[in-house]
């Protein structure tokens, strides 16, 4: 199957290893991966701030960038969710709405794609330790990808997956929310870290780099010895096992 990678801004700028891991794993699973060079930001920061006309410009660029793609896959539930918003952006423009719907229908978050499209839950990954999952808000509440990450992690040899207390709570990032409401955001991520500690996990696993960067920053500030890792890094055997704490 031919797959086009939508890398996302945070992966492209800060977490390139996540993008590389995504490509490597998809290729191991039999996919042919390309990278449409015209892709830029999905427009989510502008959209969340109320700049919908500016968002349309970004959306049109992305629609054109992936128009020839068979399937689009991204290592982010948040950015994939933004693609799903595109048809509504063009509700008063039938031509662009149809093109936006075509893109939305063929775009998947990477774990969702592996489980629901490829039909794979065991990718042959190995990692010793205990992991807990942070189910990001956009990934679960908006995209509806609730079970795929756990299905994949539960098949990782040597890894025990435990439930995160209050797992449904937001980590406090929320894009521009973390800037505009920094005090509230700080309290929210502190609560998330408390829950991670309570879980006893060695690894905090997520599917959105934005949440992981936010949580990892607070883990480091508080001196908590837990690794915050993107799920694709575990599935691609890129995470070094922790030593006994």
From Swiss-Prot:
GO cellular component terms given for this protein: cytosol
Highest taxon of the lineage: Bacteria
One GO MF term attached to the UniProt entry: oxidoreductase activity
A GO biological-process term: lactate metabolic process
Function: Is involved in L-lactate degradation and allows cells to grow with lactate as the sole carbon source.
Family listed: Belongs to the LutA/YkgE family.
Record's protein name: Lactate utilization protein A
Organism (species): Macrococcus caseolyticus (strain JCSC5402)
Lineage summary: Bacteria, Bacillati, Bacillota, Bacilli, Bacillales
């Amino acid at each position: 199957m031919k797959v086009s990678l939508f890398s996302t801004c945070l992966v492209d700028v800060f977490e390139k290893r996540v993008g590389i891991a995504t490509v490597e794993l998809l290729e191991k699973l039999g996919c042919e991966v390309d990278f449409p060079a015209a892709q830029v930001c999905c427009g989510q920061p502008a959209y969340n701030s109320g700049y919908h006309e500016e968002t349309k410009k970004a959306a049109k660029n992305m629609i054109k960038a992936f128009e020839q793609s068979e399937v689009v896959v991204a290592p982010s539930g948040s950015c994939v969710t933004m693609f799903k918003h595109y048809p509504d952006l063009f509700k008063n423009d039938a031509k662009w709405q149809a093109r936006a719907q075509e893109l939305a229908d063929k775009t998947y978050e990477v774990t969702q794609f592996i489980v629901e499209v490829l039909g794979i839950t065991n990718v042959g990954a190995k990692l010793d330790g205990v992991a807990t999952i942070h189910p990001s808000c956009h990934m679960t509440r908006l995209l509806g990808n609730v079970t795929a990450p756990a299905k994949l992690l539960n098949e990782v040899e040597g890894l025990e997956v435990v439930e995160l207390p209050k797992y449904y709570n937001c980590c406090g990032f929320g894009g521009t929310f973390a800037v505009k409401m920094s005090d509230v955001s700080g309290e929210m991520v502190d609560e998330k870290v408390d829950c991670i500690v309570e879980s006893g996990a060695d690894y905090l696993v997520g599917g959105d780099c934005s949440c992981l960067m936010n949580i990892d920053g607070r883990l480091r500030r508080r001196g908590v010895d837990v690794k915050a890792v993107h799920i694709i890094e575990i599935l691609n055997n890129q995470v070094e096992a922790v030593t006994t704490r």
